[in-house]
Amino acid sequence: MVTFRFHQYQVVGRGLPSETDEHPKIYRMKLWATNEVRAKSKFWYFLRKLKKVKKSNGQMLAINEIFEKNPTKIKNYGIWLRYQSRTGYHNMYKEYRDTTLNGAVEQMYIEMASRHRVRFPCIQIIKTATIPAKLCKRESSKQFHNSKIKFPLVTRKIRPPSRKLKTHYKASRPNLFM
């Protein structure tokens, strides 16, 4: 089983009950973090931005890690995200093929860091979804939908026809080019 750096958490929290509001609204968020502590921190960060609820006046109700139902089947994942670059905020849609959503999210973080120089704190995942093959948009994920796909054999190692011709030290370096 592959261990991923980012785990998906479901965090549930609310503002503290007061005399004016005895039953405050409960908020639930699904987010990715390396551990539970960072997931809680991210939850309060988003809640402070979206609603008038701060950690000092808030209450954490539950935090659960979400696991994939069948992590052996390859699926197409779509990720809608918002990221902060040197020029401002941008919205983006990305597609990945992976066995788990955590794997697809990790691919996304690696790609965003390499292509756009955007690190983990500057990326906000808006939505994720499993996408059927006919609704895929990106060519990078569509190329694997062909059932007759072939991969080229890049290097060919020539083996000796008999054990007698097998030597540990060759007089000349073998040519592996096809």
Curated annotation (Swiss-Prot):
Q: Name one GO molecular function term.
A: structural constituent of ribosome
| Protein's GO biological process | translation
Q: Which Gene3D superfamilies match?
A: 3.10.20.10
Signal peptide from the UniProt entry: none
The UniProt record describes its induction as: By wounding.
Is the keyword Plastid in the record?
no
The cysteines covalently paired via disulfide bonds are none
Asked if Ribonucleoprotein is a keyword of the record, the answer is yes
Query: GO cellular component annotations, sorted alphabetically?
Result: ribonucleoprotein complex; ribosome
Keywords in UniProt for this one? Ribonucleoprotein, Ribosomal protein
Q: List, alphabetically, the HAMAP family matched.
A: Ribosomal_eL20 (MF_00273)
Instruction: Give the protein family.
Output: Belongs to the eukaryotic ribosomal protein eL20 family.
This one is known as Large ribosomal subunit protein eL20
